[in-house]
Amino acid sequence: MNVKIDGRRKINSNVIVPPDKSISHRSIMIGSLANGVTEIENFLFSDDCLATINCFKNLSTDIEIRNDKIIVKGNGFALSAPKQILDCQNSGTTTRLLLGILSTQEFESILTGDSSLKKRPMKRVTVPLSQMGAEFEFLEKEDFLPIKVKGSKKLKPIEYTLPIPSAQVKSALIFASLKAEGKSVIKESPKSRDHTELMLKHAGANIKSWEKDGVYTVEILPSQISSIKIKIPSDISSAAFFIVLALICEGSSVVIENCILNPTRTGIIDVLKQMGAEIKIEDVENRNGELVGKIVARSSNLRGVKVEKNDIPRIIDEIPILAVAAAFAEGKTIIDHASELRVKESDRIKTTVEMLKSFGAECYELENGLEIIGSREKLKSAVVNSYKDHRIAMAASIMACAVEGESTILDADCVSISFPNFYDILFSSTKKI
């Protein structure tokens, strides 16, 4: 599906963005491994999260969608061997966290995915899990899906420092460590998003975490986990698109309520504020360890910045839309130390640069990042290849709203990966200037 957007639009709305994708995935996983019945409200019914549900159903977890809730009947890590291959579709989170969970199970499983997921490296997860005693076989190409997994009931505890901060790798090791024969210690620097730790602590797992001298440490002891009740807040990664839309469009403002404000996720707010963005955070409350609140953003004159290395893990999913903001800013923006972007749904360094250039922006690809020379006057409408990457498609759509003329976003239906009603909200909440 291609989408046409007539530019020079503005927004003055309260926008309801989808539930948080990271927490939606983890709620199904924790519910499946818990003892008892987990109730989940405000779940994200996107392609990625549905892949997680289907995989756990294939592992014999009883998951029921009941009105606006999901009911998960957990069996305390007593999963059953799947009768078919576990298809993770396009979801890296499903795949990598499942590798950790399946490492605790004695049966064999095979995981696969779509053509995009098959290009994403998996040894970063399988190497430390192998050290714990799980067995992996790459069935087609070394380091890539499909993978055969054989777990163990006698996993060895691990002390492991992540070479590159990654919430997915860290989470896989945490899940496996819950069933290891002793204390495991996982370290990373800087800290990546910590939803797994917070949610497992809420479910009664024996987990401690702390930061010292720039190093984040998680200590895990073998644990049973209890069922939870959770209402999932809105996803700040999805909110970021409408925040930037308000910042770069003349006479615009947006209000987003019930949004996740976990400090490991608010890097996009911090960097935009450094660029001069008028953004306010209001009505903050703590829900089971997660901060939730209201975000208000208004049209702003932005300036270029150099993004700090320690901020990269906190903005890794938002870099395409941050780059759009940078194209409208005055001066140079440098985003570096972001090699992880090379192995996302697309090579997001390359595809973000190509997307910006399509609109006439001056930008350059760096080895591990990008450099953008902002100039609103140079920007024009465009036909943009999304590369079937949901975050590229949405970032391009926001840019199309702010430039003059009609733009076309190719393969725009990929937004269903994380934000199925993105275009409904975009067109209903904006109007021509």
Swiss-Prot record:
Report what the protein is called.
3-phosphoshikimate 1-carboxyvinyltransferase
Q: Which PROSITE patterns match?
A: EPSP_SYNTHASE_1 (PS00104), EPSP_SYNTHASE_2 (PS00885)
Which pathway, metabolic or otherwise, does it act in? Metabolic intermediate biosynthesis; chorismate biosynthesis; chorismate from D-erythrose 4-phosphate and phosphoenolpyruvate: step 6/7
Location in the cell: Cytoplasm
EC number, as in UniProt:
2.5.1.19
Instruction: Tell me which residues bind phosphoenolpyruvate.
Output: K21, G92, R120, Q168, R348, R391
Active site per the UniProt annotation = D317
Q: What class of enzyme is it?
A: transferase
**What reaction(s) does this enzyme catalyze?**
3-phosphoshikimate + phosphoenolpyruvate = 5-O-(1-carboxyvinyl)-3-phosphoshikimate + phosphate
Keywords for this entry? Amino-acid biosynthesis, Aromatic amino acid biosynthesis, Cytoplasm, Transferase
The UniProt entry, under HAMAP family, shows: EPSP_synth
Q: Which residues bind 3-phosphoshikimate?
A: K21, S22, R26, S166, Q168, D317, K344
| Family that this chain belongs to | Belongs to the EPSP synthase family.
Mind listing the GO molecular function terms for this protein? 3-phosphoshikimate 1-carboxyvinyltransferase activity
User: Any one Gene Ontology biological process term?
Assistant: amino acid biosynthetic process
Q: Per its database record, what is this protein's job?
A: Catalyzes the transfer of the enolpyruvyl moiety of phosphoenolpyruvate (PEP) to the 5-hydroxyl of shikimate-3-phosphate (S3P) to produce enolpyruvyl shikimate-3-phosphate and inorganic phosphate.
Classification from the root reads: Bacteria, Bacillati, Bacillota, Bacillota incertae sedis, Caldicellulosiruptorales
How does the record describe its quaternary structure?
Answer: Monomer.
| Gene Ontology CC annotations of this record | cytoplasm
